[in-house]
Amino acid sequence: MAQVCSISVNHRHAGIEGIERARFRDPDVAMLRLLSLPGVSEAVVLQTCNRVEIYAVAESVEDIVGFARAEGMPLEIAEVRAGDDCLKGLLRLACGLESMIVGEDQILGQLKTALLQARRLGTIGPVLSTAIQKSIHVGARARIETEINKGSVSIGSAAVELAESLLGDLRGRTILVVGAGEMGTLVANAMAEKSLRAIYVANRTFEQAEKLASSLQGVAIRLERLCDYMGSADVVICATGAPHLIITKKMVEQCKGEKPLIFIDITNPRNIEETVGEVPGVTLHNIDSLRQINEASMRRRQGEARKVEAIIEEELVLLQRDIRRLHADRVIGDLYQRTDHIRATELRRAVARLSTAGSLTEQQISILHDFSMALTNKILAAPTRQLRRAAERCDEDCLRTAEELFDLWVEESNGIPGNKTKASKTD
């Protein structure tokens, strides 16, 4: 029977190189390819700077593992989950407990984006839609009822905290932020509170850089003029969504001034060439360097995390119930479809046989139709009640037995239950 399962390569077991290896060049293509596999009925891909995750509804976890292996995901550092373990992991993720920066809020927006994209592509169905929507609800509830997101709760704010720990004090410093999107904005806003000497904002779209810089009393610069400002900066934080290098070793060698320069790259894929750290007087940090910030964050939030865990346990029971109901609804739907196909076929035969003895009136045919519908519904009423009760008490065996007893298989040519191919695409 189909179940929810996931494969995740994330910061807990992989460094930035491992996460880069796991990334899909085109997540949309990956979702469509995954959905095309036999036994897979739903698929969602979630990619952030700290994780690459596949969520699917599949007959077997091995279906997803085989897909991930073929796509080149490093399974030796991946987490594979199925069933309730997968559902609980999704709730923990939305609550920020699985994040590098515990309690960070950005994951909720990332989950919403993944959900909407899967809907647009048509790769998601009722099970994953229910699970992800529930996770977003639980994540919001956790942040309202606890202080899990109090303090530095984003990669951006953690990068600022890292810069502060490296320099001791940011007052009077000059900061260059590369990127004016969501993450760049978080960094720039956090930096603006530190009594800086100057803050520069560079972005591919200059108008966006101007908008952000003006809100902070900073200076917007064009991306091609990075070198003109890099030499005067104390810290350069790269926070773009670009899939390629923006700052190279050669560029830094040409642009660096006399004073030490710190680079912090919080992107994935990385935007700063790894060899930049070899330039004399230059220090390069990436997402892996933020682990120390996360450890401190986790220590501060241990009490709040326990409160969140209690919320998760409570909501997990409700999610499990909802998923079971979906399974029961699918079995009941298949049962009614199978029965209605038989009813309609036999009704046509009865009308044809009666017509040989003389023409039937429209009223007589209507009476026969109503009779067949009433008979079918009354016969199925008790099995329907029992199947719903089975779902409530977690009796998967009962649901599976019903599928076998009523021969609930889908005919490939017309989608009518009663032939050879199992109805996994609606699970």
Curated annotation (Swiss-Prot):
It catalyses: (S)-4-amino-5-oxopentanoate + tRNA(Glu) + NADP(+) = L-glutamyl-tRNA(Glu) + NADPH + H(+). Its EC number is 1.2.1.70. It is an enzyme of class 1 (oxidoreductase). The keyword Oxidoreductase applies. Pathway: Porphyrin-containing compound metabolism; protoporphyrin-IX biosynthesis; 5-aminolevulinate from L-glutamyl-tRNA(Glu): step 1/2. Substrate binds at T48, C49, N50, R51, S99, E104, D105, Q106, Q110. NADP(+) binds at G179, A180, G181, E182, M183, G184. Possesses an unusual extended V-shaped dimeric structure with each monomer consisting of three distinct domains arranged along a curved 'spinal' alpha-helix. The N-terminal catalytic domain specifically recognizes the glutamate moiety of the substrate. The second domain is the NADPH-binding domain, and the third C-terminal domain is responsible for dimerization. During catalysis, the active site Cys acts as a nucleophile attacking the alpha-carbonyl group of tRNA-bound glutamate with the formation of a thioester intermediate between enzyme and glutamate, and the concomitant release of tRNA(Glu). The thioester intermediate is finally reduced by direct hydride transfer from NADPH, to form the product GSA. This is Glutamyl-tRNA reductase. It comes from Methanocella arvoryzae (strain DSM 22066 / NBRC 105507 / MRE50). The lineage of its organism: Archaea, Methanobacteriati, Methanobacteriota, Stenosarchaea group, Methanomicrobia. The gene is hemA.
